[in-house]
Amino acid sequence: MTFPEIVKTTLWDIIDEMSRSLSSFVKNPDKNFIRKRKLDFKKMMHLIISMESGSLNHELLKFFEYDSSVPTGSAFYQQRSKLSVSAFRHLLKEFNLKFPLEKFRGKYYLIACDGSEFNIARNPDDPDTFHEPNGKSVSGFNMVHTISLYELCSKRYLDLEVQPGRLKNEFQAICNLMDRYIYGGSPIFIADRGFSSYNVFAHAIENHVDFLIRAKDLNVQRFLGVETLPDKLDTTIELILTRTQSKKKHKHPEKESQYRYICKNI
């Protein structure tokens, strides 16, 4: 087989294996996908990950090779509602594990983390994703925010967080992604300015991963408590992060200037 054929076969094999243990990948194991239907678990997974930009009816017709008894759009929605988010996360994880990642300098995985926004079907009744009409949108729109991990050397996505557009929290997202990281090696998480915070830094350190997060000079000075930045690239600065603002609870009062408070909501 050619390499593309190996990749496709591997993907289908993982879905076959998942179909033999459905309880972990559906919302109601006692009821979901227990009857024989045209859109069973395997076909739903195949269809969703192979859909393109056409209308739902057109995608269904293509998938079933223009069969006259193609399932309806409502049947698709009904079956899709039975799938758990964990099904797609498991598929992505297992698929990546089948093909080892490329290492930078024989040791490091360079993992970029960034956010993107996507418009979804308009629904004014969903306050978590709906944005009111403004100068750019006459009728308003709904949006979700995604934060992805992308391995630069292998050019491959590793994981993803999806958040409602109005409830996005990139700090929490990157922490969740660090917690779920399973690919071993020596990862270096690389992120832009929107991810720089004490809590993210501490979370990376607690997870024993390296990180490179860009920040404005002004923010760096504020983070480190210095008026000017040194000229040399590597500088060691010791800080103590705390959840309490009470100085009486600080264990090292002699290092009071090194304490930095982290809000409990982060």
Residue ranges and their predicted role:
Residues 109-111:
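Conserved beta-strand elements of the Class I
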Residues 93-102:
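A short, well-structured juxtamembrane/interface segment
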Residues 1-56, 62-63, 67, 71, ...:
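Single, function-defining residue in the core of a domain
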Residues 128-133:
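Short Pro/Gly-enriched beta-strand edge/turn motifs at strand-loop
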